[in-house]
């Protein structure tokens, strides 16, 4: 096995080389991931119309809340795994993997159930109107329905990256983004499913990506993998994950609050189309922000 795929280098390799080795694939993956929103908006805007774009923009704060809980577990779990691998503690890394999976399952289910139960009030709070609520609801019902898949896929991919496979984690994102774009074209234009088609495409793409990541952790040659006895939640591990992941969690929540304030002001002074325009601009800005986020993930 080559050194570049050997997590033992986390404790021996030059820091600069490690930063490049982990950051470049992470940057490419994060930039590719930002294309999710851009591709969806391109297809939805052309096939459905501007109000659908506004409805999609309304969903951003709710998706950001979900992402906040995902980063709480993902950032904390992947960091702890990297530490354990540097210490050559494979069993400890495996326990963190199992605990991270269980936390993502639990949090993903809570967000899915609570989001679906109170979806309309939440969307109205985030700036939806009678003109846009249908589009936002149609999209989020499907996205929330697949929320557990999203959480587990992203969490496991982060751990795969930090456990010595940054390129493989990058390929996972590429698979999801490319498949999402292809399915968008089929579901939106050929089948005429509109904004629901975009949501279905996203969940299917993430399901395929989850299968890809799961295959990695079932491989006996992987340094950490699915094993018996790793899925029991341990207070020490959960506390460690939450303490490290709290910073990105708070950042995501703050970002959510900012978008809600923007949506409220834009609805008051510009109307539904102004919210849609902000959503488009925000997607483009996030494309460049992801470069910095990719660098931090590589760290």
Residue ranges of each PLM-predicted region?
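Hydrophobic/aromatic residues within transmembrane alpha-helices of membrane transport systems
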Residues: 28, 40-44, 56, 81, ...
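Hydrophobic residues within alpha-helical transmembrane segments
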Residues: 24, 28, 59-62, 69, ...
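Signature of the first transmembrane helix
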Residues: 17-78, 82, 243-267
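Small-residue-rich hydrophobic transmembrane alpha-helices
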Residues: 53-113, 150-169, 277-299
């Amino acid at each position: 096995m080559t050194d570049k795929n050997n997590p033992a280098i986390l404790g021996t390799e030059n820091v600069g080389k490690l930063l490049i080795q982990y950051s470049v694939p992470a940057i490419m993956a994060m930039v590719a991931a930002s294309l999710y929103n851009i591709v969806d908006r391109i297809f939805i805007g052309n096939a459905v119309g501007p109000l659908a774009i506004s409805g999609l923009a309304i969903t951003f704060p709710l998706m950001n809340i979900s992402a906040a809980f995902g980063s709480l577990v993902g950032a904390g779990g992947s960091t702890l795994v990297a530490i354990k691998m540097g210490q050559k503690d494979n069993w400890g890394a495996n326990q963190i993997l199992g605990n991270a999976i269980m936390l993502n399952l639990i949090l993903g289910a809570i967000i899915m159930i609570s989001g679906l139960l109170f979806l309309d009030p939440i969307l109205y709070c985030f700036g939806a109107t009678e003109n846009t609520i249908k589009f936002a609801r149609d999209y989020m019902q499907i996205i929330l329905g697949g929320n557990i898949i999203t959480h587990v896929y992203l969490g496991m991919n982060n751990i795969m990256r930090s456990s010595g496979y940054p390129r493989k984690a990058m390929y996972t994102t590429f698979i999801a983004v490319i498949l999402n774009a292809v399915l968008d074209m089929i579901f939106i234009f050929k089948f005429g499913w509109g904004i629901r088609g975009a949501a279905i495409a996203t969940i299917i793409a993430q399901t395929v990506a989850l299968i890809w990541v799961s295959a990695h952790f079932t491989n006996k040659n992987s340094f950490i993998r699915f094993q018996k006895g790793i899925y029991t939640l341990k207070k020490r591990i959960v506390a460690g994950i939450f303490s490290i992941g709290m910073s990105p969690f708070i950042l995501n929540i703050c970002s959510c609050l900012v978008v809600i304030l923007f949506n409220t002001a834009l609805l008051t002074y510009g109307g539904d189309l102004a919210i849609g325009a902000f959503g488009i601009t925000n997607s483009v800005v996030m494309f460049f922000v992801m470069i910095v986020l990719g660098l931090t993930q590589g760290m």
